[in-house]
Amino acid sequence: MSLIDIQNLTIKNTCEKYLIKGIDLKIFSQQINALIGESGAGKSLIAKALLEYLPFDLSCTYDSYQFDGENISRLSQYYGHTIGYISQNYAESFNDHTKLGKQLTAIYRKHYKSSKEEALSKIDKALSWVNLQSKDILNKYSFQLSGGQLERVYIASVLMLEPKLIIADEPVASLDALNGNQVMDLLQHIVLEHGQTLFIITHNLSHVLKYCQYIYVLKEGQIIERGNINHFKYEHLHPYTERLIKYRTQLKRDYYD
């Protein structure tokens, strides 16, 4: 069963150039779904289109767009507590003038009616998931943390809301190998044990082959291959996909990322 189903998604710029060309995309419920492809293919554009968060100079059309079997009219109603977004611009998610504990508490209480103590309990739990301790984080400002620490705080700020769907654009790109694998292990645990759904854009093919159940391959704005993990491990693949897997452990990052 698909949690998101969008048909004939097309994205154009102001010069009427097609960046995404009429793709059909399903994000399967309670699975880790991945979108891979080379630099400039438009992967991040698809994520932003799903969130209705495209730059003003791009236009998006589709024939139908459903979330959990219902037609979507206003996606913003799902943000936070139902759909979480992990972007690459984690450094812009926190200001430098307020302690992180206060910012995280405000984020949680914006989405859930709760006491400060309840919010802090959820924050503490989420920070532990990303291998951080509240005592080391909550009384600090964002500029006092390393880039890797701040990215993990950002991921925790999404996880603490327990969204049904997480759209993650390069969620571990700035982390070292150990913490990157730990975060991916955590995301896999959330999907397998708690029934959440993940749509991940990544250039790390080792992560794709290890963690993902369903994969889309994007080339020049078109999906050229799709299938479950067994298809990509054991069946004959499109020549382009074979080259990606054979020659690149980690793809270059997208120009549009």
UniProtKB/Swiss-Prot annotation:
Disulfide bonds: none annotated. ATP binds at residues 37-44. Gene3D superfamilies: P-loop containing nucleotide triphosphate hydrolases. GO terms for cellular component: plasma membrane. Its EC number is 7.2.2.11. It is an enzyme of class 7 (translocase). It is a peripheral membrane protein. Residues 4-245 form the ABC transporter domain. One of its GO terms (molecular function) is ATP binding. Keywords: ATP-binding, Cell membrane, Ion transport, Membrane, Nickel, Nickel transport, Nucleotide-binding, Translocase, Transport. It catalyses: Ni(2+)(out) + ATP + H2O = Ni(2+)(in) + ADP + phosphate + H(+). It is found in: Cell membrane. Part of the ABC transporter complex NikABCDE (Opp2) involved in nickel import. Probably responsible for energy coupling to the transport system. Belongs to the ABC transporter superfamily. The complex is composed of two ATP-binding proteins (NikD and NikE), two transmembrane proteins (NikB and NikC) and a solute-binding protein (NikA). This is Nickel import system ATP-binding protein NikD.
